[in-house]
């Protein structure tokens, strides 16, 4: 009976709201199961009510608390005493010096607010362990550890900001990236999430980049590599008189390195390789991710890597003309040793006018006229080959090279040649005597934290964005850098990436449906507020600490904010300020934007501010939906490194309970339909419309939402698409629409599988882009 009394107390309002669970059922179960086994038992009952999952989470927290220290300083002391302690002596000294403050302020009851997915993920990935794998801290300890790392490891211990940051983390208002969470306070605090490398076409650098990528991966970073400068297969090497192997063998080498250099032993390494479409080896590149086919059968593929295409406007124009029979689609292929610098130039304007500023187009056709091309194909042939691979593995990603460069605040620094693991980071990088390897530190804001009874708290969101900006700026100074080139880049540009999660929760709370005018307007306003709050704080930090060294010549130095770059490109109407003012009910007015422009001209601390990354772990921990995406399903099992857990859409359940429709019959129909409610006709049409899953809605809706938020994104976004069937025409429709709307990301993952309504089982959410093997830049 002792176990039952524990369960009964955990189900009461002692640890939050009282739970709607059947205590009689649990009384019978406790005779059969241990407390640990009851966690799985309760999780399996989630289909009855999401409170069973909450009870399972509370049980998991309770057991963790039973086996860990009851104060923060004691937890640190026990870890420091270990023979192989990861904690840095400086961190331990700070904790000992201020232990009375930390111990009295930390609130372990907040651990009980974690979801089951959240506490299990924390235990598996983030909480520090001893050499035997025994967990040595609680989630609240981890949050305090991160806060101290950010504000307590410099020349001055900023206690006010330590406690504020702890509060924001522990109340799940903000989250910091995975490397920050598991490396904060350690002897080698690599806190950065994303690294961008540019591979040069010489043997020394080719191998240097294998080593560099491996070292970065070992510290928890995700990597994006540009391969566009590597000469094509069979190209002549004048120094040796031999022929080049091209990119294929090099990709296989990086694939092997990734498998070996896992992220601190916590999860697999994660690399993405990028190539431009004019490269002679493009068809080889497109076949290498495949799990089936000739290359896979010969084991010449590299399926563990992620792949990305860097797509210029010229290709999209030729493709569109070919699709509509306005041209033959001719596309020329080159080897960069014979046609140099194509990846180092971009088109500043999209106009087809002969006097338009289009450096890439000019150089491309110059090389065509000089007959430097090594092959000829068509745009359709390339996109068809891309599509064959996407059907199998969901990528290569598509990044619109020219849009990314022309809308970059750092376009004066150099051409952006590639992105990162999840195609949301866009930092210039190059090799040479003054090499720069792009680095970005990530965090995300929980949009659901600002839901009020009858309104949305845009002021609170602005303030939180400012707090995260200051956090990330401090991380730049306090983190460990694996190479001098990463340090040089980060200190020069000081880029940060603030993302979001819980947008679908916001819409569900206000009973909005994706694609409605009010939802699109709110999407725009939320990201405008996020950007505004980050820029405002970055300007304030510049007054205190100075601007980033590459500020002179940046768009901001000329009084141009991120949305102004979109207006300049004719991708955003000039009246956007009035629209945002109306949606935010006067919180963000045209006058405030004008004042921000004037202030930014005087100095900005950070070269980039916002980037919309996947947020799997943050969403898992807090029970909110991932990043800016719609709900993938209303019922599914989520597979993570920690195991599989049932996730139920609580907003749908609450709406059905309001009208007395959450019955056993509806539960069974939902289960049979794999999480879809579109064919459950007992549910009102208005509710069915609001709870369409990401695949059930027209994919153009996702593009339109992306176009609404993208003008306020300093870098880019991890934009997924979901389709029932693999039809190229459907995919091209959204890609071309996104390109025409000026999006920076064409696509992250494209998912093709039967929809929820055709599956007679709970969806396994393995199709999510934020899977366990792709979490390096995730939060």
Swiss-Prot record:
InterPro entries: NrdE_NrdA_C, RNR_lg_C, RNR_lsu_N, RNR_R1-su_N, Rrm1. This is Ribonucleoside-diphosphate reductase large subunit. Keywords: Allosteric enzyme, ATP-binding, Deoxyribonucleotide synthesis, Disulfide bond, Early protein, Nucleotide-binding, Oxidoreductase. It is an enzyme of class 1 (oxidoreductase). Gene3D superfamilies: 3.20.70.20. GO terms for molecular function: ATP binding; ribonucleoside-diphosphate reductase activity, thioredoxin disulfide as acceptor. The keyword Transport does not apply. The active site is at 420 (proton acceptor), 422 (cysteine radical intermediate), 424 (proton acceptor). Belongs to the ribonucleoside diphosphate reductase large chain family. Induction: Expressed in the early phase of the viral replicative cycle. The record marks 774, 777 as: Interacts with thioredoxin/glutaredoxin. Under complex allosteric control mediated by deoxynucleoside triphosphates and ATP binding. The type of nucleotide bound at the specificity site determines substrate preference. It seems probable that ATP makes the enzyme reduce CDP and UDP, dGTP favors ADP reduction and dTTP favors GDP reduction.
